Amino acid sequence: MFEEIPTARPDTPLLDEVNSPADLRAFKKEQLPALVRELREFMLYSVGQTGGHFGAGLGVVELTVALHYLYNTPEDRIVWDVGHQAYPHKILTGRREALLNIRQENGISGFPKRDESEYDTFGVGHSSTSIGAALGMSLAARQLKTGRKAVAIIGDGAMSAGMSFEALNHAGDVKADMLVILNDNEMSISKPVGALSSYFARIWASKTYDNIREGGRKVFSGLPSALELARKAEEHMKGMVSPGMMFEELGFNYIGPIDGHDMDHLLTTIANLKDRKGPQFLHVITKKGKGFEPAEGDPIGYHAINKIEPDPKPNVDKSKLPKYCNVFGKWVCDAAEQDDKLVAITPAMKEGSDLIEFADRFPERYFDVAIAEQHAVTLAAGMACDGIKPVVAIYSTFLQRAYDQLIHDVALQNLDVLFAIDRAGLVGEDGPTHAGVYDLSYLRCIPNMVVMAPSDEDECRKMLQTGYEYKGPAAVRYPRGTGQGVDIESTLSTLKIGKSRTLRTGQSGIVICGFGRPTYDALKAANTLDATLLDMRFVKPIDEETLLTHRDAKLIVTVEENAIMGGAGSAVSELLIANNINIPTLHLGLPDQYEEHASHASMLKRVGLDADGIQKSIELKLTHL
């Protein structure tokens, strides 16, 4: 058990010999426990150097070693769900040194990524995709007769999503040759029932039991009543000591629960399941943060950590600035005090969306639906139908998963639902899988929807209240990180729908339209260029009246932290075209490509959305007028 994150690189003589799983498979089984300890210690050290997710990874060290030891990777396909648990996998697959730059600019991704390594069989970041992807690989192997094996590793939280059960149902129906491993690190499905459960897990996974069962089916195939009696006896015995009957009903052979930190048990069980025909389901119990005492005691707090600084010198001013999620957390509590019809709904984002205080103060009005974004939106729609005022707190990247429900269940019926959309824009080290850079595009095309983008924390609070009081669906998209340091009104005041504000009036004939966070960087450019700056506030409805007063402008510039295609800039151009106004325009935003992980500041500079980049782009455009 480690009590501290090592700041000096540990000695790892066994791990140093592993540059690929082929090297691992040359080890004797007796060496694996020592390798596991070295792997866990190196992972602690490396994440301490860079920051990143490590709680889930610490919990699957033994499982990762067992899988790469027994399967012929990369020929056999191992698919990790979400990817938070894949750090040990990266270390064992030739990226040990690269882990020291994980999530850094030009470093490796924090998630499995197909173009990074042949061992990363499926790119992930969002949850609950592993079973469906592994099933697809299993069926491809069947059709192409490659003999490849497919394994999906999924956490108990991700198992709550409907997509997981859709894939399980299909896999059972087509009798796919695949193994699904449930990494249960919260014991949210069921606790193992002591020694009896462990004993039967070993028996059910054994080839002897499998042969007896198949032989019995053949012998009694002509005696339906006897076969049915045997099946029921097996079900009743499993049901006494096993939580897995649900998976059996879906067509899987369920094994477990077993101790995910018992290497001998893992090796024996997985080896027995590896060559079985048909869908297999292995339930392993692990400890999130295993081997690191603080993480075992606080698995949520240690889900991810920041870089360990040897001599930390915090920026005092920056630390005092509220994060946008904190602005939301304060507003939703204040609004709930004033209106007992307000409820908060979130798909497993209680901490990230800052709903901890709300859940404590208003437990009967707080609904965490787990990783079920589609259900979260339709649940809100149902509540709104009968007089409740739901606030859906959700990350921009995850709202994409509920787009049909957003249109069909909420907007089409013009229901009073407020979407508090966090992590809008670029999200730094989490990279393209978590970037919220499409919401302005996919929201503004939906009828009845009001779409707002705050430039600072006070605007964010006002927009949340505006959206809450609006009769119909409304969305406020706000970024990750801290605000601008402006004073925040304590009252629950609102804004006029579709009305911008002028932050600066210039004389150069340049009009800059800022949407959301980039507005303050645009202000710096506006001061240099003597440009007029509009904080547009509303992407939909756009402030037509104000924009049309600038029909004689030399250049209209739009700035947004969203995809340029179909975004806020497109809304401005559409307005100008509809009114036969021929003014040169410049749309600054995110190009038609995925932006790789880096610090947020580096990403803004890369795409030209920092103050200097905005100014240079405008100056370049002026040279072509």
From Swiss-Prot:
Mg(2+) binds at D156, N185. It comes from the Bacteria. The keyword NAD does not apply. Binds 1 Mg(2+) ion per subunit. Binds 1 thiamine pyrophosphate per subunit. It holds the Pfam family DXP_synthase_N. Keywords: Isoprene biosynthesis, Magnesium, Metal-binding, Thiamine biosynthesis, Thiamine pyrophosphate, Transferase. Thiamine diphosphate binds at H84, G125, H126, S127, G157, A158, N185, F292, E373. One of its GO terms (molecular function) is 1-deoxy-D-xylulose-5-phosphate synthase activity. It is an enzyme of class 2 (transferase). Its EC number is 2.2.1.7. It catalyses: D-glyceraldehyde 3-phosphate + pyruvate + H(+) = 1-deoxy-D-xylulose 5-phosphate + CO2. One of its GO terms (cellular component) is cytosol. InterPro entries: Dxylulose-5-P_synthase, THDP-binding, Transketo_C/PFOR_II, Transketolase-like_Pyr-bd, Transketolase_BS, Transketolase_C. Its cofactor is Mg(2+); thiamine diphosphate. The keyword Zinc-finger does not apply. Homodimer. Catalyzes the acyloin condensation reaction between C atoms 2 and 3 of pyruvate and glyceraldehyde 3-phosphate to yield 1-deoxy-D-xylulose-5-phosphate (DXP). NCBIfam families: dxs, PRK05444.2-2. Belongs to the transketolase family. DXPS subfamily. This is 1-deoxy-D-xylulose-5-phosphate synthase. The gene is dxs.
